[in-house]
Amino acid sequence: MAKETLEITPDLLKNPYQKIINASASVFDEKHGRSFFSTQFYEKIEPYLKEVLTHPIDLECDLNTAKKKNRLTPLKQLFKACFNTEEILIVNNNTSAIFLIANALAQEKEIIVSYGELVGGDFNLKDILLNSGARLHLVGNINRAYLRDYRLALNENSKILFKTHNPHFKKDTPFKDLQTLAKEHDLIDYYNLGDVDLSNRVALEEILALKPSLLSFSADKFFNSAQAGIIMGQKERVEALKNHPLYRVLRVGKITLTLLFCSLKAWINHQEDITIHALLNQTKDALLQKALKLYALLKPLELNVSIASSFSKIGNLFGRELESFCVKIQPKNTRALNSEKLYLKLFQKGVIARISCEFVCFEVFSLNEKDFEKIALVLEEILNKA
C-alpha cells in the first residue's frame, strides 16, 4: 500500500507559535514557553543579537592567539567574577545538568537523596536519576530527613550526597552538615537549586558561600534568560563533566550563550526591565488595582463579574504560592453560552484563563493593561456571536 504524500500547504508554512495572554494561575509555565523578555530589555540587546545572528563570530577562535578557545570562556570569566566559583559549565537545561552529573560521576554508584526531595510538582526527578545509570539510595520520608539517615545509608558504593532545594521540608538536614559528612567519606556533595524561589537572589549566594562540590540551577528562571542549566563548583568535578562524551550532546549554541550573557549582565546591574523581578515584586495593592481595572472593563458586558482573592504559582515549582487576585466572569445567558464553552472560545483566541465552579477566572498576576483591553475586546466579540 502506497504511503500518502503530505502536501506542503500554506497552513504548514504559518508561524508555528503565537503569543498568548496568560491569565492562568501559572507564571513562567513550561506550556507557555517558561521565561520571556520585557520589550525594553529586548530593545537593548537587539543590536548585539542581530550582529551575532547575521555574521560569523569568534565562538571558538581566539582572536588574540589565532588558536581554538572554549566557547564558554567569556561567560566563565563573568560567572567567576560574579559568584566567586572555581568553574562553570552550561548545558541546555537543569534536567540535563542533573543527568550529566549523575551519569558522569555516579555511573553504577549510589546517589543518596531524601525521599521527600524527589516528590512534588510535575517533574519526576527520580526517573531522571535512575535513567542516568546511577543507583538511588533513598533516605527519610516525605517531609523529614535527618543527618543520621544519610549516615546510615553510607556504604562502599556511595558516591554523591544529593540535595534538592525544598523550603517546605518540616525537618530539613542543613546542606553544610551533608558537606561535612561528604568530606569525611570522600564523597561529592551536590546541591540542585533547580527552580529556586526566584524572588530571592540571596538563595544562590548563600549556597555558593558554602563552596559545594557541585551546584546546578535553571538559568532561564533565575536570570530571566534563554533555557539553560548552569553547573558551578570545584574545578576538578566540573572538568570531569566537561570531558565526558555526554557533554557534547548537551552543550548550548551561540544564541543561548548570547542571551545568557545579556541576561546575566542585566541581573548583575539589578535592571528593572527583567520580567521575572518586575512580576515577582508586585505588591498586593498593585495586584488589586490590576483586578479593579479589568473588572471595570468587563462590567459593562453581558457578564456577571466579581473579584476574588487567589494564588498563582511559578511553573511546576511545588508548594510556592504567590498571593494574587482574579476576576471571575459568568455569561448572563448560560443557555446560549455556558462557562465551559466560553473558556474554550477564549482559549482558541489565545486568552488562557482557568475555570472554577461554573466561572471563568482571569488571574491578574501576569497581565498588563494591554492584556486587559484585549481580553475585553475578545469577550465582546464572543458574546456578540453567541
Curated annotation (Swiss-Prot):
Keywords: Cytoplasm, Protein biosynthesis, Pyridoxal phosphate, Selenium, Transferase. Pathway: Aminoacyl-tRNA biosynthesis; selenocysteinyl-tRNA(Sec) biosynthesis; selenocysteinyl-tRNA(Sec) from L-seryl-tRNA(Sec) (bacterial route): step 1/1. GO terms for molecular function: L-seryl-tRNA(Sec) selenium transferase activity. The modification N6-(pyridoxal phosphate)lysine is found at K221. It is found in: Cytoplasm. GO terms for biological process: conversion of seryl-tRNAsec to selenocys-tRNAsec; selenocysteine incorporation. Its EC number is 2.9.1.1. Its cofactor is pyridoxal 5'-phosphate. InterPro entries: PyrdxlP-dep_Trfase, PyrdxlP-dep_Trfase_major, SelA-like, SelA_trans. It is an enzyme of class 2 (transferase). Gene3D superfamilies: 3.90.1150.180, Type I PLP-dependent aspartate aminotransferase-like (Major domain). GO terms for cellular component: cytoplasm. It comes from the Bacteria. It catalyses: L-seryl-tRNA(Sec) + selenophosphate + H(+) = L-selenocysteinyl-tRNA(Sec) + phosphate. Converts seryl-tRNA(Sec) to selenocysteinyl-tRNA(Sec) required for selenoprotein biosynthesis. Belongs to the SelA family. HAMAP family: SelA. This is L-seryl-tRNA(Sec) selenium transferase.
